[in-house]
Each structure stands twice: as structure tokens, then as C-alpha cells.
A protein has these predicted regions:
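Conserved core of the PLP fold type I
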Residues: 18-21, 25-160, 170-174
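Walker B catalytic acidic pair
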Residues: 166-167
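N-terminal basic, amphipathic alpha-helical segments
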Residues: 1-19
């Protein structure tokens, strides 16, 4: 078996820390979090984005939500129901189901060895592309920097174009 045995996990320490956390902050934990998420968490995410990705964002620009389906619904509301959305093909088809459940037009963009084919975005009149360039599912492709610049070039040609980057596991990326 590849699994680490439970004998190595410090259950006693873990249980003690959980008890301390719950008893020290009972009152605070019972309050509903603010819309958009707990400020301390959004501040930590903003620091992480700056330190590890070079992105300068304020905590007010970060929204914490209860799962991807909910958050993609918010994105659709913000970007517009009139936009034509697209996802990678092959790709994570649950994303297409989410877009379809919000009654937006969603298409598929074929991939080659470097990721999505940028020319198809133009051909299909796509407004919003949903990609996972750091580790594409299910192919595992890491989009090279040249293709990323092509994608940015596509987006810059019209103010109605957007890129949704699903960076679900970029911390595990070793190349690209």
C-alpha cells in the first residue's frame, strides 16, 4: 500500500490543538463570516499571490465562497450571460455542466501539445475562455510561456474578452 500508516500521524497533538482552537475562539467561530469571506484569510491569500505569483491584489478583490459551482455562478453574473464561454477539449467537463446550468453558451476549444488552439477562439467568437494552463486536466499539459502570451494577445484585442484561469494545483508544477 502507498498509504502512510496512522501510527505516524500525531493524533494526540492534533486533537489537543483542535481543542485549544475551539475553546479559545468559540464566540468568534459562531459568527457568520462577512460576504466575500473572512478578512484574515483574504489578506493571507493576497500575500501568497504576491509572494508566489507576483500578483498585486487587495483583499477586497478576493472572494471566498462555498465551492466552485457557487463561485463560477458569481463569475457568470459579473461577466454576463450574453457572453460566449469556452472550455478546453479534452477538459474537466463538470465546468461545462456549470456553464450550461446557468444557461450560457459554452463551446469547446481543441488542444495541441501546447494547450488550447488560440485560432479557434477567434473562429468560434469566444468571449470567455476557461483554462487550466499550469496542469491541464486530463492531459497534464503545462502551457508554455509563448502560448500564454498568444492567449493574452487574443484577450487584449477586445474589451469583452476574459480569461478564467483555474490554477487548481500550480504549486505542484515542476516545469513550464
Amino acid at each position: 500500500s502507498n498509504q502512510t500508516g496512522s501510527v505516524y500521524f500525531p493524533f494526540a497533538i492534533w486533537a489537543r490543538r483542535i481543542r485549544e482552537l475551539l475553546s479559545d475562539s468559540q464566540q468568534k467561530r459562531m459568527i457568520n463570516p462577512p460576504c466575500g469571506g473572512i478578512l484574515e484569510l483574504r489578506e493571507a491569500i493576497a500575500r501568497h499571490l504576491k509572494d508566489f505569483h507576483g500578483l498585486h491584489v487587495s483583499p477586497e478583490q478576493i472572494i471566498i465562497g462555498a465551492g466552485t459551482e457557487y463561485l463560477y455562478g458569481i463569475l457568470i453574473q459579473l461577466l454576463g450571460f450574453d457572453k460566449k464561454y469556452a472550455i478546453e477539449d479534452p477538459g474537466y467537463h463538470k465546468i461545462a455542466k456549470i456553464y450550461n446550468s446557468h444557461n450560457v453558451d459554452c463551446d469547446y476549444i481543441a488542444m495541441d501539445d501546447s494547450g488550447i488552439r488560440i485560432s479557434e477562439l477567434e473562429e468560434k467568437n469566444i468571449d470567455v475562455i476557461h483554462i487550466s494552463p499550469s496542469h491541464q486536466f486530463p492531459t497534464g499539459i503545462t502551457m508554455p510561456i509563448g502560448r500564454r502570451y498568444e492567449l493574452l494577445g487574443w484577450a487584449s484585442k477586445a474589451p469583452s474578452r476574459y480569461i478564467i484561469e483555474d490554477d487548481y494545483d500550480s504549486e505542484f508544477r515542476l516545469t513550464g
